[in-house]
Regions:
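A generic structural signal for tightly packed, nonpolar segments enriched in small/aliphatic residues
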Residues: 2, 6-171
Length: 171
């Protein structure tokens, strides 16, 4: 898919545009056969899951299982949420291929809508999106985490790549 024209109806949702461009570039120029992306995409994910668990959205159960194993090994929590096609419709635009947010809509599900935007560019490539919007920063010390930016997801990705290698998936 070309880096298509988007209706930027929310200037606070620019990160998902950059992420969509990165996904498109990876597919078209690098020939990737799976995509694992991680981003502080929405505040809505913290409302849903709190600040110690990231949200995961995927189109591929096998890839999700590998990331779940990596998360468990890293002691970082994730929760899979649905890619709800009923929420996808709020991204339809009258003037472009796609709106970049559900701004002006009352449907809610903003973390899902953000992931659905990125999913448009993934198409059929096995993909998982980890929304770390609620987990990137903490104001309290707890376990391995100290106050401030905590690097949530770094250990998870490292452990996931080890799982992939062990299972014979080319990393």
């Amino acid at each position: 898919r070309q880096m298509c024209i988007r209706d930027r109806n929310n200037t606070d949702a620019e990160g998902r545009i950059t992420l969509a461009d990165a996904v498109t570039y990876a597919k078209q120029c690098c020939g990737v056969d799976r995509i694992v992306d991680i981003a502080t995409l929405t505040d809505g994910i913290q409302t849903a899951l709190g600040n110690r668990r990231c949200g995961a959205f995927s189109n591929n159960r096998a890839l999700t299982a590998q990331v779940e194993k990596g998360a468990a090994a890293a002691c970082e929590r994730m929760w899979e949420l649905p890619c709800d096609e009923n929420l996808r419709r709020v991204l339809d635009s009258r003037v472009a291929h796609l709106k970049n947010s559900a701004m002006g809509s009352s449907v809610g599900g903003y973390a899902t809508v953000g992931a659905m935007f990125v999913k448009e560019f993934v198409e059929e490539t096995p993909w998982i999106h980890l929304d770390i919007g609620g987990t990137a920063w903490t104001t309290e010390c707890e376990g391995i985490y100290t106050k401030g930016g905590i690097g949530f997801g770094t250990r998870m990705l490292y452990e996931t790549f080890k799982v992939m290698e062990k299972e014979g998936t080319q990393v």
